[in-house]
């Protein structure tokens, strides 16, 4: 499966968490050359139906949400996203965070959008997936969270002390 996906796309898209078995069906829906049909990754995500859409009239938002597009490739990216719930990858962490923040449906759509953007970038630029880029972001997010906890504890009159390893 991995060798066939590499042959079709020119890059190993099965490295993206969640896209293991879905790489070939996605190829059958979107094809090899994404750049001529979709100038940007946002155009690709919009075609998949993974982008929010705001209907405005007179400056007032009448409706906000994801457009109802029945796109099989978009459904496959959603399936890939929903399979990450128990995955211990950065994308799995992102899914759990978004589900807690936005709700299950919107969290899956947000993660599917992120997977689609990564997929588009890998295929059009012919670069390999590098999960180490996520490590710095996660470390930064944890550091900010720790600072926030310390600030809240200080405001309540407490002091946080890190545990010493045994």
Model regions: which residues?
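A detector of single, family-specific signature residues
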Residues: 1-166
